[in-house]
């Protein structure tokens, strides 16, 4: 079955909470781009437009005791974990109520058992260390780390996989493979495959090509349970799509690549599957994000309190 067929078949099974979260992340990211365009935000940002379904699919497979490690494209990772758009926006804008007092910004967030970083590959060895701690002190909990295809160019990835395999650590590695590392197509910077590289260390690999939440969870539930029960690390590779440029700048991809990404956008596929229900949910989350932007923008600047 084609990707489009699978999405149309199963999209009606996406419950209201899942659909609301998908659309919340989409409109949050669009709002950030609008704020940057109007000069109301400083620094840079990397949206997860097109990839929102990955953390949403995983959220019901993760437990409160698990540690989650996001990356530079991590707004969706955070929102799927906490559903706290106001706190995250305040952090990015440097406003009162910011998650980290306004000093972390878009990429560097720490809250409870969640952390994100903009340093490529850095989170994987840290996650391996946390997984070792969990294995010793909290059996059944795992460390889940999100990385991209470009991160496989970092040596720390292989050091972490080596030790994780040797020590059979409860480490879940989520690879969001959108086919391009910043502005370099993956086919031009990676020899071999993610699967082959993981399996070279004796680490299990599972590929996901669908954006259907129910199908993804059905596939991954027993595999994630195996990570928790001592089966060792697992690499799950999502073949996904990045709708926009790497950051806020020009998109260097050819028009055909961008068209393919938009054709496979979960947003379009889910909208076609259940138009009326989707439209209601879409408008509700658009209005929610608009209200949050107005409210957070009116707050005073945040203050860092060590």
Residue ranges and their predicted role:
Residues 1-55, 60-61, 246-306:
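Conserved acidic/glycine
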Residues 4, 100-104, 229-231:
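Feature targets compositionally biased, intrinsically disordered low-complexity regions
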Residues 15-18, 63, 119, 229:
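A generic structural signal for short, non-catalytic loop/turn and secondary-structure boundary residues
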Residues 22, 68-70, 89, 236, ...:
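Generic structural hydrophobic/aromatic packing signal, biased to beta-strands
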Residues 27-33, 38-167, 185-195, 200-202:
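Cofactor-binding active-site loop characterized by glycine-rich and histidine/acidic residues
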Residues 112-301:
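Glycine-rich ThDP/TPP pyrophosphate-binding loop and its adjacent helix/strand module
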């Amino acid at each position: 079955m084609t990707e489009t067929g699978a999405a149309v078949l199963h999209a009606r099974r996406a419950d209201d909470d899942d659909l609301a979260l998908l659309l919340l992340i989409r409109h949050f990211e669009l709002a950030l781009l609008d704020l940057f365009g109007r000069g109301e935000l400083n620094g840079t940002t990397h949206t997860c437009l097109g990839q929102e379904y990955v953390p949403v699919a995983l959220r019901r497979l993760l437990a409160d005791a698990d540690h989650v490690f996001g990356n530079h494209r991590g707004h969706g990772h955070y929102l799927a974990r906490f559903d706290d758009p106001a706190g995250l926006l305040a952090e990015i804008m440097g406003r009162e109520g910011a998650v980290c007092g306004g000093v972390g910004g878009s990429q560097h967030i720490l809250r409870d058992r969640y952390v994100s970083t903009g340093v490529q590959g850095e989170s994987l060895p840290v996650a391996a260390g946390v997984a070792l701690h969990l294995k010793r002190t909290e059996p059944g909990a795992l460390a889940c780390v999100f990385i991209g295809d470009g991160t496989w160019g970092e040596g720390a990835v292989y050091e972490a996989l080596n030790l994780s395999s040797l020590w059979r650590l409860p480490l879940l590695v989520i690879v969001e493979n959108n086919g391009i590392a910043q502005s370099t197509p993956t086919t031009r910077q990676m020899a071999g495959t993610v699967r082959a590289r993981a399996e070279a260390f004796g680490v299990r690999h599972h590929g996901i090509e669908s954006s259907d939440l129910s199908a993804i969870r059905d596939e991954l539930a027993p595999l994630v349970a195996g990570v928790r029960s001592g089966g060792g690390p697992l690499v799950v590779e999502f073949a996904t799509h990045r709708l926009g440029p790497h950051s806020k700048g020009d998109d260097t991809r050819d028009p055909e690549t961008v068209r393919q990404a938009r054709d496979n956008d979960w947003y379009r596929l889910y909208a076609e599957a259940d138009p009326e229900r989707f439209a209601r949910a879409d408008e509700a989350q658009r209005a929610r994000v608009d209200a949050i932007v107005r409210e957070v923008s009116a707050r005073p600047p945040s203050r860092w309190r060590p």
